[in-house]
């Protein structure tokens, strides 16, 4: 059985965090360990997380950042911490559980069966027979964003921003997360850009051939999301920054070059 660590970034989630669902899942899945990162919350998030850790101490760890750093840095620090422990797969999951925890074993099974794939990322595609509940405005905003992201990455990816991703715990992925990202929110794009740059000019398969977009069976918009219209506008500017930094890569990066 593979060992899995899932990083869960949390900022002021005291009222929304469904500790019962996390605890119940932990009771059933001894192979999955959760690493919650409290990103400088100003509410009772730390108390709630400590309560969950006390209930499932062997499978729950809490990392507390002294001040708010943004989702990108919270996830990155959690991933770096996860790589310091023994695990086969490492990933991150949104705390609101828009993607249910039952999807984690599906991602693991897929990586088990496809040794050519290095990462599985959730994709919110509304298809018949699937329960993907996304507002119309978010859907169309997402399509604009995804089209822009595909241009920046030169990879036809459908959904970069779903908060459910799982990676093989390899030195290559450790390098990708070794330095802070240049944006606070759309770091998902930068993850793919870094992988693409590491493999550019090498004999390894290209990034587009080792990342699998997994169409989710269930996903739902959760009330209280912290992504606002101004964040969407800012993300377009951030995309330009990513393109400038990675869009004209000339070869594999050295550690620390990010």
Write out the residue ranges for each language-model feature.
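Acceptor/aglycone-binding surface of glycosyltransferases and processive sugar-polymer synthases
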Residues: 65-84, 89, 101-185, 222-225
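Acidic helix N-cap motif at the loop->helix transition within catalytic regions
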Residues: 15-19, 43-52
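Short beta-strand/loop segment that forms part of the nucleotide-sugar
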Residues: 8, 22, 30-41, 63-65
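Hydrophobic helical membrane-anchoring modules
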Residues: 1-4, 178-258
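Short, well-formed alpha-helical segments that are part of the catalytic scaffolds
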Residues: 12-27
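Donor nucleotide-sugar binding loop of glycosyltransferases
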Residues: 13-16, 41, 71, 100
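A conserved acidic beta->alpha catalytic loop
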Residues: 38-47, 97
């Amino acid at each position: 059985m593979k060992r899995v660590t899932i990083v869960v970034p949390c900022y002021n989630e005291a009222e929304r965090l469904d500790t019962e669902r996390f605890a119940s899942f932990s009771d059933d899945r001894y192979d999955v360990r959760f690493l919650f990162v409290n990103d400088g919350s100003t509410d009772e998030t730390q108390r709630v997380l400590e309560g969950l850790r006390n209930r499932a101490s062997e499978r729950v760890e809490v990392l507390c950042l002294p001040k708010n750093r943004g989702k990108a840095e919270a996830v990155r620090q959690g991933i770096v911490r996860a790589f310091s422990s023994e695990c086969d797969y490492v990933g991150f999951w949104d705390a609101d559980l828009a993607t249910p925890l039952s999807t984690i074993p599906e991602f693991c099974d897929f990586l088990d069966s496809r040794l050519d794939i290095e990462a599985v990322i959730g994709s919110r595609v509304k298809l018949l027979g699937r329960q993907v509940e996304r507002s119309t405005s978010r859907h169309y905003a997402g399509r604009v964003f995804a089209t822009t992201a595909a241009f920046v990455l030169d990879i036809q990816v459908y959904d970069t921003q779903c908060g459910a991703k799982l990676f093989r715990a390899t030195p290559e992925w450790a390098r990708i997360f070794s330095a802070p990202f240049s944006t606070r929110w759309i770091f998902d794009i930068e993850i793919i850009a870094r992988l693409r740059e590491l493999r550019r000019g090498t004999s390894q398969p290209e990034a587009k051939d080792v990342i699998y977009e997994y169409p989710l069976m269930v996903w739902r918009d959760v009330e209280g999301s912290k992504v606002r219209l101004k964040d969407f506008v800012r993300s377009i500017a951030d995309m330009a920054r990513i393109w400038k930094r990675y869009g004209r890569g000339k070869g594999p990066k050295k550690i620390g070059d990010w």
